[in-house]
C-alpha cells in the first residue's frame, strides 16, 4: 500500500497479470499509477512500475505485503537523475546493484567509470552485482574529466571536459574496436567472438593489490589494453 505525505493511504493492491491501476488522492492533485508485470519479458521477475504525477512534497511511504508463504525479497530503484528532480531520493539508499540496462545483459561487457588520474571510483557510477549473482560490471574504464568535442566555433572544434559512465562506455568501445581490428583485419585471431573478446579484456585488466576481485565497483579490474597484449605474449607483471 501507499501513504502520501499527508497521511492518506491507498489500500493493499493485489498483483494481477498485466494489470494497471490508477488512483487520485483526495487532498491535493497527486495521482499514482501502478503497472504490474507478473513475468517481466527481460528478467522473468515480478515487476511493479510506479508512476507519481504531481506528487505532494514530503515523504511517500510504500509498504510491500507478501501474499504467499516462503522466502521473499524485493528491490526498488528510482529513475536515473536526468529523469527526476534532484530532491527525489530514498531515505536509506543502497548504492549496490544500480547499473542500468543493458549493462546487466548476458554476453555484454558492462563497465563502470573511474578517475584515471587518482584511480578513485566515480561516485555517480552504477555498481554491481547483478541480482542473480553474475559479476557486473566486468570492468571499469576512465570516465572522469575526459576531453570531448562539444561543438564548433568559427570552424574550430570546441573541446570541453565531461564525466559519466557513457564516456567510460565510449572509451571501452574504442578499445574493443581497435582490438577487433588487430584480431580480424590483421589476421591475428579471426575466429574471435563476443565472449572471447570479453575474456581477453578481463584477463588483461589492471588490478590494485589493495583490493579483492571481482568487486562491485571495478568488477574484474580496470581497462588496460597493454595488459591484454602482455597476457597474450605471456608477460607476467610484477
Model regions: which residues?
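C-terminal domain-closing interface element
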Residues: 210-238
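Short, electropositive, low-hydrophobicity segments enriched in small/polar residues
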Residues: 116, 130, 168, 172-174, ...
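Catalytic-core segments of hydrolase enzymes
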Residues: 1-26, 32-36, 41-149, 203-205
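A generic structural signal for ordered secondary structure
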Residues: 2, 179-183, 228-236
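Short glycine/serine/threonine-biased micro-segments
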Residues: 124-126, 162, 217-219
Amino acid at each position: 500500500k501507499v501513504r502520501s505525505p499527508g497521511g492518506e493511504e491507498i489500500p493493499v493492491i493485489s498483483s494481477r497479470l498485466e494489470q494497471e491501476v490508477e488512483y487520485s488522492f483526495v487532498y491535493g492533485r497527486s495521482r499514482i499509477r501502478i503497472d504490474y508485470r507478473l513475468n517481466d519479458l527481460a528478467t522473468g521477475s515480478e515487476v511493479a512500475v510506479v508512476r507519481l504525477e504531481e506528487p505532494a512534497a514530503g515523504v511517500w511511504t510504500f509498504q510491500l505485503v507478501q501474499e504467499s508463504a516462503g522466502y521473499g525479497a524485493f528491490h526498488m530503484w528510482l529513475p536515473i537523475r536526468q529523469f527526476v528532480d534532484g530532491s527525489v531520493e530514498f531515505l536509506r539508499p543502497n548504492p549496490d546493484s544500480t547499473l542500468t540496462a543493458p549493462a546487466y545483459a548476458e554476453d555484454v561487457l558492462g563497465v563502470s567509470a573511474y578517475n584515471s588520474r587518482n584511480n578513485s571510483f566515480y561516485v555517480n557510477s552504477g555498481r554491481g552485482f547483478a541480482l542473480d549473482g553474475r559479476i557486473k560490471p566486468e570492468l571499469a574504464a576512465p570516465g572522469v574529466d575526459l576531453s570531448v568535442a562539444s561543438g564548433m566555433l568559427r570552424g574550430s572544434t570546441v573541446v570541453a571536459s565531461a564525466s559519466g559512465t557513457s564516456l567510460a562506455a565510449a572509451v571501452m568501445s574504442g578499445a574493443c574496436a581497435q582490438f577487433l581490428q588487430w584480431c580480424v583485419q590483421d589476421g591475428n585471431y579471426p575466429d574471435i567472438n563476443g565472449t572471447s573478446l570479453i575474456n581477453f579484456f578481463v584477463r588483461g585488466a589492471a588490478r590494485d593489490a589493495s583490493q579483492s576481485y571481482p568487486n562491485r565497483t571495478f568488477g574484474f579490474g580496470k581497462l588496460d589494453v597493454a595488459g591484454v597484449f602482455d597476457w597474450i605474449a605471456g608477460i607476467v607483471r610484477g
